[in-house]
A protein has these predicted regions:
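Condensing-enzyme catalytic core mediating Claisen C-C bond formation in acyl metabolism
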Residues: 1-24, 36, 142, 220-283, ...
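Active-site-proximal alpha-helical scaffold in enzymes
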Residues: 87-117, 167-196, 248-255, 342-361, ...
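Flexible glycine-/small-residue-enriched beta->alpha junction loops
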Residues: 110-165
Length: 385
């Protein structure tokens, strides 16, 4: 049976909105991790057969197939192509899936997967709102579709509404969310202080550590914030941060490992993606995880570490309730509430952390999942070698 191996993975530190990476062109952010990936892996860049990058809101400096632009901006061989994909927040996790599928199919031997996002420069949903307004489209991407309206009516398609729906359905209180958010910051700060992220990150100029975690946060401070929606429970403190960053990883076939003298660090054990209610939007990791475990024959207890994106605290808390996963195995170094969520880069960012943490702890299986626009969720299971 063919295998897809993870050879190397690296990310930038995640910058806060308006922080140390905010003025960096997205192509240069992506180029930075690509250059480092080639150096760390030792592979001949000309042997790479494709570069698959995730990126949302592909307008302005993020337009024009940024995967290709990042590669060229890195000074790497022109004969290597690139393609940019958009599965919303799961874009670069899907990039890993496409890269792995190319390797598993036998049609490719060396593929780079990654992602980049500068949310300081291009705000979230800019492509669906502000960029469309000069063309007369002012009500979002679903307005005007007869088929959509016939199926879903005029229900709001909004991530904050989805987070509140999850909190209500699974009985998750504001206090539950705030305690989870505080723990995310505490875990992230511990990871930074202990140097757990040092191997997986490459500094960009003076930005050497993740900028998001707050040492001065507390339950008391969180309790003073207004909910995002009137009468709701979700506040900014329980939500992922607006962020800037990039990440990249190299996947290889058995033949490439042999011919290029590479050392595989993990194998892709499973990859899948599922969908559900696009209005609730953010709960798809629950059925997607169940699907993945059934397909592999694994139990949740067989998974040593989990990275589930902390888009909002209710997303992870509902997932924990449904799966019965041990919270001490989940987001052990904090998550997007503390560390940030650079949209199109987050999938590979999380997988980079998962790989390095499996190596640090000696774990075998790591599972990654995340909620995505449209009510979707990717699941990837990697096995440390």
């Amino acid at each position: 049976m063919a295998e897809a191996y993870v050879v190397e993975a690296v990310r930038t530190p995640v910058g806060r909105r308006g922080g140390g990476l905010s003025g960096v062109h997205p192509a240069d952010l992506g180029a930075h991790v690509l250059k480092e990936l080639m150096v760390r892996s030792g592979v001949d860049p000309a042997a790479v057969e494709d570069v698959v990058f995730g990126c949302l809101d592909a307008v302005g400096p993020q337009a024009g197939d940024i995967a290709r632009t990042c590669w060229l901006a890195a000074g790497l061989p022109e004969e290597v192509p690139g393609v940019t994909i958009d599965r919303q927040c799961g874009s670069s996790q899907q990039a890993v899936h496409f890269a792995a599928q190319g390797v598993l199919s036998g049609t490719q031997d060396l593929v780079v997967a990654g992602g980049v996002q500068n949310m300081s420069q291009i705000p979230i949903a800019f492509a669906t709102r502000q960029a469309a307004e000069p063309l007369g489209f002012t009500a979002g991407p679903f307005a005007g579709s007869e088929g959509w309206r016939a199926r879903y009516g005029d229900q709001p398609v909004n991530q904050f509404v989805g987070a509140e729906m999850i909190a209500a359905k699974w009985g998750i209180s504001r206090r539950d969310q705030e305690e989870f958010a505080l723990r995310s910051h505490q875990r992230a700060l511990r990871a930074i202080d202990e140097g757990r992220f040092d191997r997986e990150t490459v500094a960009y100029g003076p930005v050497a550590v993740d900028e998001g975690p707050r040492r001065d946060t507390s339950l008391e401070k969180m309790a003073g914030l207004k909910p995002v929606l009137d009468g709701g429970t979700v506040t900014a403190a329980c939500s992922s941060q607006v962020s800037d960053g990039a990440a990249a990883m190299l996947l290889a076939s058995e033949r490439a490992v042999r011919e290029h003298g590479l050392t595989p660090r993990a194998r892709v054990h499973h990859l899948s993606v599922r969908g559900e209610d696009p209005i609730r939007m953010l709960s798809a990791p629950i059925p997607a995880t169940a699907h993945a475990l059934k397909k592999t024959g694994l139990t949740i207890d067989a998974i040593d570490l989990v990275e589930i994106n902390e888009a909002f605290a209710p997303v992870v808390l509902a997932w924990l309730k449904e799966t019965g996963a041990d919270p001490d195995k989940v987001n052990v170094n904090g998550g997007a509430i503390a560390l940030g969520h650079p949209l199109g880069a987050t999938g590979v960012k999380l997988m980079t952390t998962l790989l390095h943490e499996l190596e640090r702890t000696g774990g075998r299986f790591g599972l990654q999942t995340m909620c995505e626009g449209g009510g979707q969720a990717n699941v990837t299971i990697i096995e440390r070698i």
